[in-house]
C-alpha cells in the first residue's frame, strides 16, 4: 500500500507576512487616492457626477483664507499620494519611518472623521433630529437647494462613505506599517 504525500500534510492556517500585508495596504490606499484625486480634478473642471442635482460642485474661493486652505489641501493630496507608495517601495526607506507612520495615522483619522461626520450629519437631517445637521447650515446653504432630491442626498452620502473608506485604508496602512517595522526589528 502506498501513501501519498498529501495524506501526511497537516493543515496550517495561512497567514500573510507583515510585508505582504503592508504592500496590500499600500496598494489599496494608493488606488483609493488615485480615484479620489481623479474625482477632484473632474469636479474642478466642472463635472457634476457625484453631487446629484446640486448646482455647484466647488465653491468659489473668495478670500485669502480660502486660497490658503486650498493650498493646504493640495499639499495633503501630494503627501497622501506619496505615502502609500513609500510604505512598500525601496525608495520609501529614505523617508523616516515615523513620518510615514504619522502621515498614515493622521490621514486615516482626518478622513474617517470627515466621512463619519458627514454620515452623521445626513442621518441627523434625514431623521429630523437636527434640521441643520452638525454644521448648523440648512440644505439651501450647504447644497444650494432648499429641498434636495434623493439623488443629491444619496450622492452626498456616497461621498461621505468614500472619505470614511479612505480613512479605514490609511489606518490599515498605519497598522500594517507598524507590524512590518516590528517584524524587521526596527522601531525608528
Where are the predicted features?
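Transmembrane alpha-helical insertion/packing segments
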Residues: 2-72
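Individual transmembrane alpha-helices with interfacial aromatic-anchor signatures
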Residues: 23, 103, 140-166
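C-terminal TM-helix exit segments that contain a strictly Trp-centered aromatic cap at the helix terminus
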Residues: 35-47, 109-131
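Membrane-interface interhelical loops and short amphipathic "cap" helices
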Residues: 47-65, 126-154
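Core segments of alpha-helical transmembrane spans in multipass integral membrane proteins
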Residues: 64-86, 105-109
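Hydrophobic cores of alpha-helical transmembrane segments in multi-pass inner/ER membrane proteins
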Residues: 73-82, 158-173
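Loop-to-transmembrane helix junctions at the membrane interface
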Residues: 86-109, 113
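Cytosolic juxtamembrane helix at the C-terminal end of the final transmembrane segment
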Residues: 88-92, 127, 168-188
